[in-house]
Curated annotation (Swiss-Prot):
Classification via SUPFAM superfamilies: GroES-like
Taxon lineage: Bacteria, Pseudomonadati, Thermodesulfobacteriota, Desulfovibrionia, Desulfovibrionales
Keyword check for Cell cycle: no
Record's protein name: Co-chaperonin GroES
Subunit relationships: Heptamer of 7 subunits arranged in a ring. Interacts with the chaperonin GroEL.
A matching Pfam family: Cpn10
UniProt source species: Oleidesulfovibrio alaskensis (strain ATCC BAA-1058 / DSM 17464 / G20) (Desulfovibrio alaskensis)
Location of this chain's protein in the cell: Cytoplasm
InterPro entries listed in its UniProt record: Chaperonin_GroES, Chaperonin_GroES_sf, Chaprnonin_Cpn10_CS, GroES-like_sf
Gene Ontology cellular component list: cytoplasm
Biological processes, Gene Ontology terms: chaperone cofactor-dependent protein refolding
Alphabetical list of PROSITE patterns matching this protein: CHAPERONINS_CPN10 (PS00681)
Length: 95
């Protein structure tokens, strides 16, 4: 299935969190928090300003981003969990 976000929305695939702590302890699945970073899979054209002009998106396909763990709406594409969120929900681009 192919999904194209509209306006200022972004399709993000969550990146799995680490399974081991810095001290070498393994974290069970029940104790893991939802990852708050992911890879941008698709972006919309941008937000429309009051004067009708489209404001270009800052993020682009392939960017790794940081977002609030409660951001976006969860969708399942081809059996894989993704998020559709507004660009404003993205806190930073990880470089």
């Amino acid at each position: 299935m192919n999904l194209k976000p509209l306006n200022d929305r972004v399709l993000v695939k969550r990146l799995e969190s680490e399974e081991k702590t810095a001290g070498g302890l393994y974290i069970p699945d029940t104790a893991k928090e939802k990852p708050s970073r992911g890879e941008v899979i698709a972006v919309g054209p941008g937000k429309t300003a009051d004067d009708g002009k489209v404001i270009a998106m800052t993020v682009k396909t392939g960017d790794v981003v940081l977002f609030n763990k409660y951001a976006g709406t969860e969708v399942k594409l081809d059996g894989v969990d993704h998020l559709v969120m507004r660009e404003d929900d993205i806190l930073a681009i990880i470089q």
